[in-house]
From Swiss-Prot:
Keywords: Ribonucleoprotein, Ribosomal protein. The keyword Protein transport does not apply. This is Large ribosomal subunit protein bL17. Part of the 50S ribosomal subunit. Contacts protein L32. Pfam families: Ribosomal_L17. One of its GO terms (molecular function) is structural constituent of ribosome. It comes from Gloeothece citriformis (strain PCC 7424) (Cyanothece sp. (strain PCC 7424)). Belongs to the bacterial ribosomal protein bL17 family. Gene3D superfamilies: Ribosomal protein L17. Disulfide bonds: none annotated. The keyword Ribosomal protein applies. One of its GO terms (biological process) is translation. One of its GO terms (cellular component) is cytosolic large ribosomal subunit.
Amino acid sequence: MRHRCRVPQLGRPADQRKALLRALTTELIRHGQITTTLTRAKAVRSQADKMITLAKDGSLAARRQAMGYIYDKQLVHRLFDQAQERYSNRNGGYTRVVRTLRRRGDNAEMAIIELV
Protein backbone atom coordinates (compact mmCIF):
# COMPACT_ATOMS: atom_id res chain seq x y z
CA MET A 1 0.00 0.00 0.00
CA ARG A 2 1.18 3.51 -0.80
CA HIS A 3 0.17 5.38 2.33
CA ARG A 4 1.49 8.94 2.45
CA CYS A 5 3.83 8.44 -0.50
CA ARG A 6 4.86 11.99 -1.33
CA VAL A 7 7.38 11.42 -4.14
CA PRO A 8 6.19 10.10 -7.52
CA GLN A 9 7.92 6.81 -8.28
CA LEU A 10 8.45 7.68 -11.99
CA GLY A 11 8.79 3.99 -12.82
CA ARG A 12 12.40 3.81 -11.64
CA PRO A 13 14.44 2.51 -8.70
CA ALA A 14 15.34 5.01 -6.01
CA ASP A 15 18.89 5.74 -7.19
CA GLN A 16 17.82 6.30 -10.80
CA ARG A 17 14.91 8.48 -9.67
CA LYS A 18 17.19 10.68 -7.56
CA ALA A 19 19.67 11.01 -10.43
CA LEU A 20 16.85 11.94 -12.83
CA LEU A 21 15.53 14.63 -10.48
CA ARG A 22 19.04 16.02 -9.97
CA ALA A 23 19.61 16.18 -13.73
CA LEU A 24 16.24 17.83 -14.40
CA THR A 25 16.81 20.37 -11.62
CA THR A 26 20.27 21.19 -12.96
CA GLU A 27 18.96 21.72 -16.49
CA LEU A 28 16.02 23.80 -15.25
CA ILE A 29 18.37 26.14 -13.40
CA ARG A 30 20.75 26.28 -16.38
CA HIS A 31 18.16 26.99 -19.10
CA GLY A 32 15.32 28.64 -17.18
CA GLN A 33 12.69 26.31 -18.62
CA ILE A 34 12.47 22.70 -19.77
CA THR A 35 9.83 20.56 -21.43
CA THR A 36 9.13 17.22 -19.76
CA THR A 37 6.23 15.04 -18.71
CA LEU A 38 3.72 16.49 -16.27
CA THR A 39 4.59 14.06 -13.47
CA ARG A 40 8.31 14.77 -13.79
CA ALA A 41 7.65 18.50 -13.84
CA LYS A 42 5.65 18.28 -10.62
CA ALA A 43 8.37 16.17 -9.00
CA VAL A 44 11.20 18.52 -9.99
CA ARG A 45 9.25 21.60 -8.85
CA SER A 46 9.86 20.95 -5.16
CA GLN A 47 13.56 20.22 -5.67
CA ALA A 48 14.09 23.41 -7.68
CA ASP A 49 12.29 25.44 -5.01
CA LYS A 50 14.57 23.95 -2.35
CA MET A 51 17.70 24.87 -4.33
CA ILE A 52 16.51 28.45 -4.84
CA THR A 53 15.67 28.75 -1.14
CA LEU A 54 19.21 27.60 -0.33
CA ALA A 55 20.56 30.19 -2.77
CA LYS A 56 18.53 32.94 -1.10
CA ASP A 57 20.06 31.95 2.24
CA GLY A 58 23.51 32.46 0.75
CA SER A 59 25.51 30.94 3.59
CA LEU A 60 28.54 28.73 3.08
CA ALA A 61 26.68 25.69 4.42
CA ALA A 62 23.80 26.30 2.00
CA ARG A 63 26.26 26.67 -0.89
CA ARG A 64 27.92 23.37 -0.01
CA GLN A 65 24.56 21.64 0.27
CA ALA A 66 23.56 22.94 -3.17
CA MET A 67 26.89 21.80 -4.63
CA GLY A 68 26.11 18.31 -3.38
CA TYR A 69 22.86 18.29 -5.35
CA ILE A 70 23.44 20.34 -8.52
CA TYR A 71 25.87 18.75 -10.95
CA ASP A 72 27.60 21.92 -12.22
CA LYS A 73 29.77 23.93 -9.81
CA GLN A 74 29.73 27.13 -11.91
CA LEU A 75 25.95 26.88 -12.12
CA VAL A 76 25.75 26.87 -8.32
CA HIS A 77 27.83 30.05 -8.16
CA ARG A 78 25.64 31.72 -10.80
CA LEU A 79 22.46 30.67 -8.96
CA PHE A 80 23.72 32.04 -5.65
CA ASP A 81 24.72 35.34 -7.28
CA GLN A 82 21.36 35.89 -9.00
CA ALA A 83 18.90 34.49 -6.46
CA GLN A 84 19.21 37.33 -3.94
CA GLU A 85 18.10 40.03 -6.35
CA ARG A 86 15.73 37.93 -8.46
CA TYR A 87 13.70 36.25 -5.69
CA SER A 88 14.14 38.61 -2.74
CA ASN A 89 10.44 39.56 -2.53
CA ARG A 90 9.07 36.05 -3.18
CA ASN A 91 8.58 33.44 -0.47
CA GLY A 92 8.38 30.18 -2.39
CA GLY A 93 6.66 29.41 -5.66
CA TYR A 94 9.73 30.03 -7.78
CA THR A 95 8.59 27.74 -10.61
CA ARG A 96 5.58 27.56 -12.89
CA VAL A 97 4.23 24.37 -14.51
CA VAL A 98 2.27 24.95 -17.73
CA ARG A 99 0.55 22.05 -19.47
CA THR A 100 1.19 21.68 -23.20
CA LEU A 101 0.12 19.33 -25.97
CA ARG A 102 0.40 15.61 -25.39
CA ARG A 103 3.46 13.82 -26.75
CA ARG A 104 2.85 12.34 -30.17
CA GLY A 105 4.54 8.97 -29.66
CA ASP A 106 2.81 7.71 -26.52
CA ASN A 107 0.21 10.41 -25.76
CA ALA A 108 1.89 11.29 -22.46
CA GLU A 109 0.87 14.53 -20.73
CA MET A 110 3.61 17.09 -21.33
CA ALA A 111 4.37 20.28 -19.46
CA ILE A 112 6.79 23.18 -19.50
CA ILE A 113 8.34 23.98 -16.14
CA GLU A 114 9.95 27.40 -15.92
CA LEU A 115 11.51 29.66 -13.35
CA VAL A 116 9.33 32.66 -12.52
